[in-house]
Design a protein with these regions (language model features):
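Conserved donor NDP-sugar-binding/catalytic core segment of glycosyltransferases
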Residues: 95-124
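A conserved acidic beta->alpha catalytic loop
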Residues: 37-46, 64, 90
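Short aromatic/hydrophobic "clamp" motif used to bind/position activated sugar donors
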Residues: 83
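Short, flexible, basic/aromatic active-site loop/helix in glycosyltransferases
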Residues: 113-150
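Acidic donor-binding/catalytic loop of UDP-sugar-dependent glycosyltransferases
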Residues: 43, 88-102, 179
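Acidic donor-binding loop at a coil-to-helix junction in glycosyltransferase catalytic cores
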Residues: 171-177
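Short, well-formed alpha-helical segments that are part of the catalytic scaffolds
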Residues: 12-25
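Glycine-rich, basic loop-to-helix element that forms the pyrophosphate-binding segment
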Residues: 62-78
Length: 244
């Protein structure tokens, strides 16, 4: 099989069905799904298991709660050539995996990510993601490639070689992974299409102005010193997993 789709969850009963339904409709079928749960107290497990007869599916209880730990645990239990990390609240088009696979067939790529689009009609949300796409992905990649954790596709051998996500990093772990892969000589690609459709629930909780400021501050730290960027921002940004 080609892809192992890894999804960390924590109390995602309202959202997880969205991405799992999208996966059911994919035109490209060569994949398994590995959901790693951080001891949800809602009906996340029940929602996930509704799809157990739709495609190869593993639902695993994580020994430890944390988005990076859960992603790494999913990767350890994955068996395919490429790992795809999705957040539990994203949506994708029916031909998303087909387009990703076509790109991988044409080029020898170790890590791949895409532009994102908000699941929202609000102009401010479009602006925030335009900023993320153009500034934090397109422009910054000239200094050092980055990735947004809502979708990362990475060759499993490459991921394993660098030790996966750093589990003590609670903000910026996605950019950290991309940087360490790049620094180790692995190849990178950023696609404008197909886009991942991303929930704006964090915007609703934290406030849009706060999210803009947070991203600007993070980008400033990165541009000042990409080598120590991750270590410098730890503790400076509140970014909780599963707190919605």
């Amino acid at each position: 099989m080609k892809f192992s789709i890894c999804i960390p969850t924590l109390n995602e009963e309202k959202y997880i069905g969205g991405i799992l339904s999208c996966l059911e409709k994919q035109t490209f079928r060569d994949f398994e799904v590995v959901v790693v749960d951080g001891e949800s107290v809602d009906k996340t497990k029940e929602e996930v298991l509704k799809f157990s007869d739709k495609y190869p599916l593993k639902f695993l209880k994580s020994p430890q709660r944390g988005v990076s730990f859960q992603r790494n645990f999913a990767a350890k239990n994955a068996v395919n050539e490429y790992l795809i990390f999705f957040d539990a609240d994203v949506m994708i088009e029916n031909d998303f995996l087909e387009k990703i696979n076509n790109h991988l067939e044409k080029q020898n790529i170790d890590i791949l990510t895409t532009w994102n689009k908000p699941i929202s009609d609000k102009p401010v949300d479009e602006f925030i993601y335009l900023f993320v796409n153009i500034f934090m992905l397109e422009l910054i990649k000239k200094k050092s490639p980055g990735a947004v954790g809502v979708f990362i596709c990475v060759r499993k051998k490459s991921f394993d070689k660098i030790g996966g996500f750093r589990e003590k990093v609670n903000f910026g772990e996605d950019f950290d992974l991309a940087k360490r892969l790049h620094d180790s000589g692995f190849t990178y690609a950023l696609l404008k299409k197909p886009k991942v459709h991303v929930s704006v629930r964090r915007f609703d909780k934290e406030g849009r102005l706060n999210m803009i400021i947070k991203n600007l501050r993070a980008a400033t730290y990165y541009l000042r010193d990409k080598n120590d960027f991750i270590d410098k921002i730890q503790g400076k940004f509140k970014h909780e997993f599963g707190k919605f």
